[in-house]
Amino acid sequence: FPMTVTRYYLSLIDWDNPFCDPVFRMCIPSIEETDLSGDFDTSGEADNTVISGLQHKYDQTALILSTHRCAMYCRHCFRKRLVGISDDETADNIEEMAAYVSQHSEISNILISGGDAFLNSNQVIKRYLEQFSSIPHLDLIRFGTRIPVVLPMRIYDDPELLALLKTYTQKKQIYVVTQFNHPNELTDEARKAVKALLDSGI
């Protein structure tokens, strides 16, 4: 499986004792990953895919795999079959997905995930927001991302992204769903990214 780690996240590792460091274990490959037994699609995502990149497993939620890329490939990821490897399962037609959601009034929210949703360009993020914010029966739009944890400056140093989120959350409530796995990830930079999101109404 591929390895990609941001310089920022590497800086959180205690290099005097790396093999016992929780951040190290989340980002540096282990020999245990060579055990390929088991199922690569542990949550049955293939069975719930209705359009390339769009899953509809739960009545009220549509899940979009917006990209196969991440800023860091977490060693515990349950989508190892695709992240950093293949875009075969990711979205390639935003308009088609929006049309599907429009035709299914039971869907009250979408989760734009990946890969990492915030590794998309601002232009792509805007296209998602444009398409889905106009659907009346959607209550909210969620973005699944580890960017606040592994590359927080992507958020707090990007006024264009923050302005985009601030504008569209006034049309349709936006949530950012992230994942802090250890207290060592709760840095000043991460807090700054979270505060920037909160200050933008997210």
Protein language model annotation of sequence segments:
Residues 2, 47-78:
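N-terminal pre-triad scaffold of radical SAM enzymes
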Residues 25, 66, 85:
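A conserved cap/lid and substrate-binding interface adjacent to the catalytic center
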Residues 95-109, 118-202:
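Conserved AdoMet/S-adenosylmethionine-binding subsite of the radical SAM
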Residues 68, 78, 114, 145-147, ...:
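Short, structured patches in soluble enzyme cores that scaffold and shape functional sites
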Residues 77-89:
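Iron-sulfur (Fe-S) cluster-binding segments and ferredoxin-like electron-carrier domains
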Residues 46, 58, 89-93, 157, ...:
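Short secondary-structure boundary/capping elements
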Residues 64-65, 76-77, 109-118, 132:
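Conserved catalytic-core segments centered on acid/base and nucleophilic motifs
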Residues 1-57:
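Flexible, acidic/Gly-rich N-terminal and inter-domain linker regions that tether
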